[in-house]
Swiss-Prot record:
Protein name, UniProt field: Uncharacterized protein MT1889
Occurrences of domain CBS (ranges): 217-280, 285-342
Similarity remark: Belongs to the TerC family.
Family matches, as SUPFAM superfamilies: CBS-domain pair (SSF54631)
Membrane-spanning parts: 3-23, 95-115, 312-332
CDD domains to which the protein is assigned, alphabetical: CBS_pair_CorC_HlyC_assoc
Residue pairs linked by disulfide bridges in the UniProt entry: none
Coiled coil: none
PANTHER family, A to Z: HLYC_CORC FAMILY TRANSPORTER (PTHR43099:SF5), UPF0053 PROTEIN YRKA (PTHR43099)
Lineage: Bacteria, Bacillati, Actinomycetota, Actinomycetes, Mycobacteriales
InterPro entries membership: CBS_dom, CBS_dom_sf, CNNM, Ion_transp-like_CBS, UPF0053_domain
Species the sequence originates in: Mycobacterium tuberculosis (strain CDC 1551 / Oshkosh)
Length: 345
């Protein structure tokens, strides 16, 4: 092979190495949520990258195979080519062969590390989604051609991993833990990227999975209920007005003559019934009062109460006894902070 062809082949191998390194780091670094957003904007290559990421072990094996083969061939072709180039271009034919080969190898290694490794790696890390969308489509063509070799190496690697007790992964885990996210929020506050109100709101949102209904439940002794006027009938207008005047709340649990909860009333349900304090409210107006265990996470309680469209719920102990009450507003306030308005609760 003449010198020019050998040099061009060496540069081509460095380019191939850079291609595989860039594709590998782009696949690892690209965030699925950003790719999904790009896919929703109609970027077909984003969908291609997402699908490639779902076969991550095969993709990485293919990249490593490509890097290895390119590096071996570069060593085989590049070093002799540089030796000949130095001899012809710079008149170094009189230099001892050992020194000339050492110098040529150093030049090839430097070009390989800089252009074939570091530059493509940093380009991929600087813009992983953009780089992945550019490199992955042609990379998949190579993967299809090299699939038999990739499958053999991938299966061997997985077998070795299982032998040492490591479970192979088919997809990159990009999730962060609650603790890591809390640290990120704290750092954002200290750096001025978040104000104190935003920091508090985000912190509350993170801890909702660890907060239970018992943490926000109102004890029975603090509940202002209205009692039915007689068995089989509802409370009176006067009873509801008195409760409203005392608390300013808009919803009141209803109890029977024995003190058992039978539902709750919203103040708007009785506005059309007149202003006679002795008027008895029909039990049909009383809304159902669901029950939630005190050990239920607040996030689940929020979902349950929203699903059944109830603003109040009885809180029960493990034995089923009623120990308190929780309002939907209490759950929301634990998430976003206290809210005050003219119809609090």
């Amino acid at each position: 092979m003449d010198v020019l062809s050998a040099v061009l082949l060496a540069l081509l191998l460095i380019g191939a190495n850079a291609f595989f390194v860039g594709a590998e780091f782009a696949l690892i670094s690209a965030r699925r949520d950003r790719l999904e957003a790009l896919a929703e904007q109609g970027k077909a290559t984003a969908v291609t990258v997402i699908r490639a990421g779902e076969q991550l072990p095969a993709m990485l094996t293919g990249a490593q195979l490509g890097v290895t083969v390119s590096s071996i061939l570069l060593g085989r072709v590049g070093e002799p080519a540089v030796v000949k180039l130095l001899q012809l271009s710079f008149g170094l034919s009189g230099v001892p062969p050992a020194l000339l080969h050492t110098l040529s190898l150093a030049i090839v290694v430097a070009l390989h590390v800089l252009l074939g490794e570091m530059v493509p790696k940093n380009i991929a890390l600087a813009g992983p989604e953009r780089t992945a969308m550019l490199l992955v489509p042609p990379y998949l063509v190579y993967v299809r051609l090299a699939r038999p070799f990739i499958a053999v190496y991938n299966n061997c690697a997985n077998a070795i991993l299982r032998l040492v007790g490591v479970q192979p992964k088919d997809e990159l885990d990009i999730a962060v833990s609650t603790a890591e996210l809390s640290e990120m929020i704290a750092e954002s506050l200290s750096e001025g990227l978040l104000d104190h109100e935003e920091h508090t709101r985000l912190t509350r949102a993170l801890r909702i999975r660890t907060r239970l209904v018992a943490d926000v439940a109102v004890p029975l002794v603090n509940i202002r209920a209205v009692q039915v006027s007689a068995v089989g009938s509802g409370p009176t207008i006067g009873g509801v007005e008195q409760a409203l005047a005392q608390t300013g709340y808009s919803r009141f649990p209803v109890v029977d003559r024995g003190g058992r909860f039978i539902g709750y009333l919203h103040i708007k349900d009785v506005l059309t019934l007149g202003d006679n304090p002795q008027t008895v409210i029909d039990l049909a107006v009383v809304r159902p009062l669901p029950r939630v265990p005190q050990s239920l996470p607040l996030a689940d309680a929020l979902s349950r109460m929203r699903r059944i469209n109830s603003h109040l719920a009885l809180v029960t102990a493990d034995n089923g006894s009623v120990v308190g009450m929780v309002a939907l507003e209490d759950v929301v306030e634990d998430l976003v902070g206290t809210m005050r308005d003219g119809t609090h609760r």
